[in-house]
Amino acid sequence: MEHHEDNAQLDNYLQNRLAESLQICGGAGEHNPHLADATGGNGCAPGIAPSKSDEVDGEEDEEWKYIHEVRQSEKLQQEKLPLTKETGNGFGPGRDSDNQVHGNGAAAVFNLYEEDVEVIKNDGDFSTNSNTTTSTDEVVARQAQEPNQLPEQLQQQQQIESQGVHEDPRQEDEDEHSSVATTYGTSSLSENNSSPLDQEEVVMVAQTVGQEQLVDFDNKENSYFVKNLEENHSQLNPNAVAFVPGVGSQSSSPLPAAEDPLPGVQPRPFLPGGTLDDLVAESPRKEFARINMDGIAVPDEREFDIEADMRPHELEQESDTFGAGHLEMQLLNGIGTADQAALRDVLDHGPETSVDMELPLDQVPNDADIMKQSIYAEHNSSIEDILNSVQPLPIQTCDDKELIHVEEKEHVSKSPSTEELQFQSDFPNNQESHTLFNNTEQDPMQASFYLEHTSQKAQEGCQEQMQLPAECSDIFADQSLLLDTSAPQLSSEADSPVAKLELESQQAGIVDITPSPLSSTAEKHLVEDTKELVEEYTLDPESHFFGVVSSQAPLQLFGKHTLPSIIHSCKHRVASEQNDEENAVFESVSGYETQNFDEISSPPEGINPFAQPFTPAHLVIEQANTMMEDVGGMPIPASEDFAICDKVASKSSNEVEDHRSEQQAFVKEELLHPVGDVVAQVENLGTEKNFVVEEERLPISVSDEIPLSSASKEKLLPDTTDEQLLTSALEEKLRSVAPEESVSTAADGQSISQFDEYVIASNKPLEDILEPEKDVEVAKSLSEKTSVATVAGGAVVGATKTHSATKAGSTAASAKSKTETLVMKKTTASSTSVYGANKSAAPRPSTARLGIKSTSIATKTSTTSSLTGNPRKSLSSNVGSTVKPPTKLSGTRPATAPVSKVTLGAKTITNKPTASGTASDNVTRTTLRPLVSTNARRPATSGTGSVASSTARRPVTNAKGSAPGSAASTKVRPAATMTAPVKPKVLSPRSTISSTTTVRKVPSTSTPSFSTRSPNKQQSNGLGKNTSSTTTSTATATITKSFTARSAPKFTHSASLTYNNGSTSRRLLVPGSSSTTTTSSLRKSSPLKAAPGKAASKPLTPQSKDGTAKSSPAVLKARNSTLMGGEGVAPSNECVPTPNGQINAEEVVKLKGKGLAEEVKIIEEQKLHEQDVPAHNAEVPLLDF
């Protein structure tokens, strides 16, 4: 670099001196002798060079200055940097054979060729200066001379370095003389030319314009050589030579070596550009472009304006607004009035185009320019239309669909309904085929769940003709608001199939997204139609003659199924069942129910006793035979049940309708939470109100069409099939208890307390009847639930609930009908506690609606409550002291979990009587949590977690709410918080339970033994039975609703589904204390939803902090009931636990606006009922998680 710097300085001096010397020398001839001497035998070249130099000295003087300076720099570089040897141009193909030999140490091979190259270089330099100095002849001479010149050139270079300016004349002559030899194109990169000054001078002297041209030719030769090394640089350099004058142009010139950049840079400053670093960096053509730009005369503003005025079409229209208007024209082409001009301007941008623009501007009227306008304008306009219209459409469509689906998911995905929807989409063809086979009753299925609007209209007409009053559409309209997920499914028409219980059941699967509207309408219709159904039920005994068939036959009868249609459906069910149990169930029970039922059906298969009951065909046939064997002439009890239902319907049809509105709102709130069963329970809320009315008769004979009516009403949503089958199977056994049940139902219709007692009493018979079956079912359901729980927390909940729902569906269907009748009567009793319990029950139904499977489980839970009623009485007493069940919670839901297990197995039945008998209010509060726990937990957590969840809530209920209405409601949320730990049950179906149990142990240590109890295991185990039975005794009836909703939680965590009522709220509260986060999270989300009432949310959270505050869902619902009693909606929110605890409260508010107050009242009553049925709730926690 020092050499480069020195060379740069010397080059500056030399450039100035050489410019003067060249001018003075005029002729290179004088110097040529010196060059010849210096070259030592360059005589030929000097002779050639002088002649050429003489020819064009004037021209060369200018070029010579540049070339000489370049060569001086090269010489300096060569001498000082022999190794660097022409880093710039000289670095190329042997610029100076000397330099290559010396500096670069280039192989001798290059020396001769390099000499030629050097000649060419020098010529290139000159040529760049427009000096055609060297010819091929000169190059040849130079080649001959260079071998001798190399040492002389080195000497000359050294002398030049020492003499500096004094050498200039000699150098000039030498350069001129050697110009032929040195004209090698690399000299064009003279910056780096390492050729001796003598050679450079000779070349410069000799270079003429013609010579430069020849040099260019030589440069081509050099280019060939450069291809070896430097030609790439020299090739660039020939153009760069113009820029070479830039002193700092080294970097700009492509120098393979950085050795000569400075010398190359020095010559470049001579370029007009001054320092050519920038110019050199740019391509020489660019510089020419700059020159052209500079050459372009820019008119003054005034002149330009004048010119513009002369061409208004160009400038005013186009040029003046060149950027804006023209751009628009360019983009839009033909959009603007000045489109033609704009097109022209667009085509002609820049000074050249502007120049050309004048002519085209005259031709501007030629809009016919196909290139400019027609093509662009047409394409652009069409594209714009397409883009503007098409893009927004897909986006909007996607957004709308996404919003719809998102809402559906928000509401339904929390429950099995989304999966059920998938099932519906999978089974709609089957459903349609069933509809073709089964009559218009299945038309809603034909229409597909998306719409039961189209088919529902026809169905609506049929239903109106048959049993459903026009009120269905009105109710449905109210419910459609409740059902945010699928408004179309919410259509009253969809609900109108409620009269067609099978259609409702089938539709239940379809309406999973819209569980509450269908269920609400179905409930009202069930209430109103209960009498009609009972009246038609006289027809049912024929269909009821089929026993189990009657279980779903009542649905058909209710759905205007005549005995032939029922028989046909039964046959179809049998055939389909033979083909596919799920398909058969869907077909026979209801095309719509098929989807939800399919969802439920696979889990029911796990519960073999109920798996067949789940499949309507098996239920109809097998249970018909079984019931005929077990119950004997139970079809008569079915008619008795219908008579009871008539009484109850007449008595509580208003109450039931109120409960329905309440439950509908609650269900709609919980629509989001449970999936399959919840949807069914949307109807089931109302249906369960009727179901309470009907279940009074239902327990008498589930297989009777009463169970089907109540079950299908519950199942009008997807859960119908499970509950119908379960209800029929369980109620067949219940029919043995039927007298008892009828009495209890009648008494319950009359008084709430009697209803509780009857529920307990009836539940005991249920327990007795169902316990063996439940034990078997528990084994299957436990195995299934265990596997299902292992498979997925939510899926397990759904599957387990499906099985549980199937088992408990029948049992709980009857029990629920009993319990719910009781609940309704409690509500009628207008007890605040009972009303709160009913509200709790209502949220559960909402959950049940959301999850059809949950509904089935709820039904199962109801049955379980009946069976476990006595044990639950002890828990019920514990519920009276909420702390005690929480103490059991130290076992982490032991009390609740056993109930859940009991729900899965016969134990549930055992728990139910106890809970019912013990304290309907406390039990109801307790039940709310167990309900959720049993539904979601039991499937999700093998038993321990769900039990803990249930226990935690129930203890809270017991501890918090001796007064089920207010205290229970306040405690409900703490229970939910306490219950949150239960959520882990869903996370780990079996294993999580222990951790969950541990968490629950913290809230309540009273049930530590049940901590290990898995929801399924505990059913078989008596462990959860006794401890949790008391807690869940009252909850059992409520569980029928919410559990049905929660039964289908496809989510691994049924927590959201289970949270339908206070139970979910409790879980929400539990999460803080919960050892398992996932379950807690699920509960958290569901409790908010589960808390339809705002008050419920506030009380729940504070009490969740209370370790013992984990009141069972019943407690939460009891408090909610109190709130609900004051404000129907508030308890509903609390009672409606959803996967998102927050959503339910919001939904309740939404429901309020659309006449939800009524539904809220119903929900409150149901909460009271649920509180009255703690056994189911206690069981539900196991099912939940």
Swiss-Prot record:
The modification Phosphothreonine is found at T721. GO terms for biological process: centrosome cycle; mitotic cell cycle. One of its GO terms (cellular component) is microtubule associated complex. This is 205 kDa microtubule-associated protein. It is found in: Cytoplasm, Cytoskeleton; Cytoplasm, Cytoskeleton, Spindle. Phosphorylation of various serine residues may play a regulatory role. The basic domain contains numerous sequences that match known consensus sequences of several different protein kinases. It comes from the Eukaryota. The modification Phosphotyrosine is found at Y450. Its main location: cytoplasm. Residues 179-196, 867-881, 908-936, 989-999, 1016-1026, 1054-1066, 1100-1111 have a biased composition (Polar residues). Residues 146-159, 856-866, 940-952, 1003-1015 have a biased composition (Low complexity). Residues 146-196, 856-1035, 1054-1114 are annotated as: Disordered. The gene is Map205. Residues 745-977 are annotated as: Microtubule-binding. May play an important role in the regulation of microtubule assembly and interaction. Keywords: Cytoplasm, Cytoskeleton, Microtubule, Phosphoprotein. The keyword Cell inner membrane does not apply.
